[in-house]
């Protein structure tokens, strides 16, 4: 409360909610302000039952990735951007990548010993790091890069290389998919695809590199690079309208890809598709009318070791309050 005019700012709000867009009343006695309770509920679409159910106790977390053997999981808390590892059932929680600014997008190495992730510092471009999965000091993958965002790391099946997307720098609209040899730090580039791409995903058998076509700031299709033929192929043509094609994940056998996209009428309500790597027509896996996504990147989705879709549901609230000022 304001009991008398003050020459210094006075805090009006407290607690876990975030407050925004304050507007004073005409008589100056009140302030109308929007309060946001930002949190999510992790849910899984059970493909056998066709029902949505809480996952890992419904924690508020996203960016999940499971170890290759399916025994462990890494995720980012929401809000807060803290990386945690745990057993598959959510027990034995341990923080990794401490003292980072905003770590997210974690990926287990094939042998489970390391985790690659992206950190968004307060200033400067995003950076890719690798950290021991049991905790330790993160090591930057491309320490010489100072101009471009490094995003979406993906492991080669043998764990010796990382592929990542280098986003457009200021004044440059091109993107690059780089492959880094982790023992030598030598960098190679994938051949330029027909369309600009982002979000690489190495197939489990190592033959393919999947990428999302990127007509910045939107993503609208899928392309795949065949390391055997050394050629790109368009797997899914552009999806017109919003939302974009997002968050592709390989099936365990490497024969198909799960992704989130719009329905036939270009509406977004939690639609998950699967498409085979040979380019057959996409199959609708989950259709969730009324689903409201949450998370730092809003419409994240992944799959669990049994290939059930997992998503973060918006469990927060938005209210408008009137704060009376005591003069």
Question: Which positions does each model-derived feature cover?
Answer:
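Structural motif
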Residues: 1, 39-43, 80-84, 123-129, ...
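A generic "binding-loop/recognition-motif" signal
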Residues: 18, 38, 48, 60, ...
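Surface-exposed loop and edge beta-strand positions of immunoglobulin-like domains
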Residues: 34, 45, 76, 86, ...
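C-terminal recognition in membrane/secretory proteostasis and scaffolding
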Residues: 263-265, 278, 284, 302, ...
